[in-house]
Amino acid sequence: MAHTEQYRFPKDFWWGSSASATQMEGAADRDGKGQNIWDYWFEKEPHRFFDHVGPADTSQFYDNYKEDIRLMKELGHNSFRMSISWSRLIPNGTGEINDKAADFYNNVIDELIANGIEPFVNLFHFDMPMALQKIGGWVNRETVDAYENYARTCFRLFGGRVKKWFTHNEPIVPVEGGYLYDFHYPNKVDFKEAVQVGFHTMLSSARAIQAYREMKQDGKIGIILNLTPSYPRSSHPADVKAGEIADAFFNRSFLDPSVKGEFPKELVDILKHEGFMPDYNAEDLDIIKKNTVDLLGVNYYQPRRVKAKEHLPNPDAPFLPDRYFDPYVMPGRKMNPHRGWEIYEKGVYDILINLKENYGNIECFISENGMGVEGEERFRDEQGIIQDDYRIEFIKEHLKWIHRAIQEGSNVKGYHLWTFMDNWSWTNAYKNRYGFVSVNLEKDGERTVKKSGKWFKEVAEHSGF
């Protein structure tokens, strides 16, 4: 590649990728790990998972972490975001620590650092320990106490070496999946519980931040949010209002309390009007107010487009946020034909400028961005390399908009692709591939670097393209 970079990034920019414990570790029932909701749900309803592939069959990072981390180094990573499996470290959610799990995470952290890769560590990535789900999960306030204890345990065990912590990844997703739209366990449709889950998750984040600061570990702590911009169909006031309400439900519900310490008035007004306020006390709001994040991870894949409701909602149907807006399919939109998602690269710029203008230009980074492709094997050449030019194009076009945001003063510090190697995408299992590295499940998880991985190495090494 000729090194006439048109897009130069700061020399200390964080280049890397992100992943989560349940999606890549494998070894779901080994070495003392307790069950989480994914292990349990797969056992109960394997037919709901693509090709009946469950969390025990994921990408075997548990056994191959040394080789995988060496590969990260080869692909130019200076940082990598992982998560700790709560039910691996503390099998029942509370109580005894699993020493083998502590050893594993210590080894992974040490190996990353030895390879010049800074570990970014997230505490919760959709994987509630089953023992806690049995008492209600995030609906039950006791889970908040258990989570704070888990967070303190992680800080104590790993905080000497880990200086970038995150309390949650996409906390709105377990709310949507578990309590509104039936794509996570416990598969309920119950808006009252959804609100309680959201509130307790937010409180748990603030309490972990408070604990981290009490422990004086001289790092930074934040949260990772999927900030999908809500674009209205038109400038008609009804469409604009639909966009603002969707934004309050899905973005500002966690963004505002995480960065500003308070919930958006538009959302609170709707919850009061509809009779869905959560149980809480004044001290909870004070803890949320005082314990805002140092650093924000931004996950961005696709925009959300909405319009004013076309029809009156069925009064007997369960209450869902969609009572206030309809999805809008914009004619002529650019699509990822392999995944059914819209590609709108400017969305990442819009998020960063919004954070700059309305959220104090908080220090942030792109913590996930990526392109899932079904049937990626058809792009493998004679040498066995997947020629994923579509992924290179996708990353490049997003990086151009991130670069523009930096030129305009955005405090964005890095870019992590989802994900390093193909991983298990929850109920979609291995249907859509996202990695820089392909994983062949038929050949014992054999790793092969894709064309995009080689390209990314060049970009990271030159901090630009």
Swiss-Prot record:
SUPFAM superfamilies, per database record: (Trans)glycosidases (SSF51445)
Keywords: Carbohydrate metabolism, Glycosidase, Hydrolase, Polysaccharide degradation
Cystine bridges: none
Classification via PROSITE patterns: GLYCOSYL_HYDROL_F1_1
Keyword Hydrolase: yes
Catalysed reactions listed for this entry: 6-phospho-beta-D-glucosyl-(1->4)-D-glucose + H2O = D-glucose 6-phosphate + D-glucose
InterPro entries documented for this protein: Glyco_hydro_1, Glyco_hydro_1_AS, Glycoside_hydrolase_SF
Active-site residues per Swiss-Prot or TrEMBL entry: E170, E368
Induction: Up-regulated by konjac glucomannan and by cellobiose and mannobiose, the possible degradation products of glucomannan. Repressed by glucose via the carbon catabolite repression system. Also repressed by GmuR. Is not induced by aryl-beta-D-glucosides such as arbutin or salicin.
Keyword Hydrolase found: yes
Molecular function terms, GO-annotated: 6-phospho-beta-glucosidase activity; beta-glucosidase activity
Gene Ontology cellular component terms for the protein in this record: cytosol
Enzyme Commission number, as recorded: 3.2.1.86
Any GO BP annotation: carbohydrate catabolic process
Pfam families: Glyco_hydro_1 (PF00232)
Function summary: Phospho-beta-D-glucosidase that seems to be involved in the degradation of glucomannan. Is also capable of hydrolyzing aryl-phospho-beta-D-glucosides, although very weakly, and plays only a minor role, if any, in the degradation of these substrates in vivo.
Family, similarity comment: Belongs to the glycosyl hydrolase 1 family.
Protein's UniProt name: 6-phospho-beta-glucosidase GmuD
Native organism: Bacillus subtilis (strain 168)
Organism phylogeny: Bacteria, Bacillati, Bacillota, Bacilli, Bacillales
